[in-house]
A protein has these predicted regions:
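N-terminal hydrophobic/helix-forming segments and targeting peptides
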Residues: 1-96
């Protein structure tokens, strides 16, 4: 994607807009990010494939969406809260 006449401030606004999208390799955050980028560059072609589809040596995984996650101390204090920083959770984590 080549976008001409774009300064650093505009790119920073895009990054700020996209920060909260919970992106992984699948899921609503990834689709929302791609749609956002398509609004910037209408020439972007977006393709989707069903989970389980074989692509070369890789099977497309099940969709993964996250809404909340955290580590909680026995006192009830929460740490590494996803709602405060979406980098606290690794994609495809599973609840314990």
């Amino acid at each position: 994607m080549i976008i001409r006449n774009t300064d650093g401030r505009q790119m920073l606004r895009w990054m700020e807009d996209l920060w909260d999208y919970p992106r992984s390799i699948t899921g609503h955050g990834t689709r929302s990010t791609l749609e956002y980028l398509k609004n910037i560059n209408p020439d972007l072609n977006i393709h989707s494939f069903k989970s389980g589809t074989r692509v070369f040596d890789w099977d497309i995984p099940d969709e993964w969406n996250i809404y909340d996650a955290y580590i909680e101390h026995e006192s009830g204090q929460k740490f590494a809260e996803f709602t405060k920083n979406n980098l606290h959770v690794l994609g495809y984590s599973i609840p314990c």
